[in-house]
Amino acid sequence: MLLKRLIKLAIFLFFVAVGFIIFIGSFWLNTYNTKEWANLLAEKDASGLIVQIIPNINQWFKGTVEQQQKLFQTLVHFFIPVGFGLLFGIAVAIIADLFYHLIKYLIKRSFKKN
């Protein structure tokens, strides 16, 4: 029972990580070269797909960072994209779990009819 829960947790964390990588790579930075991510996250602007979806995201991002105390600006600057990435990853994991349970239900239902 514990092993089954650990496996489910590992699968959930895998999907969260995949969603996080997709968000940071595609939506925020527009690159999957992870060696560049630290330097690109240190810049003030998002450059990925999120700029097309929400055109004023960079203005909001700069305004939010500038409102913080000087000591916390760098911290907030990294937490915003990382936080959005984690939320996106959790959403991907939940959607994958829903699809898994839906397919499992449909397969069980199709065998019960026969």
UniProtKB/Swiss-Prot annotation:
UniProt keyword terms in alphabetical order: Cell membrane, Membrane, Transmembrane, Transmembrane helix
Annotated InterPro entries: MPN454_MG319 (IPR054989)
Main location: membrane
Highest taxon of source: Bacteria
Residues that span the membrane, as ranges: 9-29, 75-95
Disulfide bonds: none
Organism: Mycoplasma pneumoniae (strain ATCC 29342 / M129 / Subtype 1)
Membrane protein topology class: Multi-pass membrane protein
Protein name: Uncharacterized protein MG267 homolog
A single GO cellular-component term on record: plasma membrane
Location in or out of the cell: Cell membrane
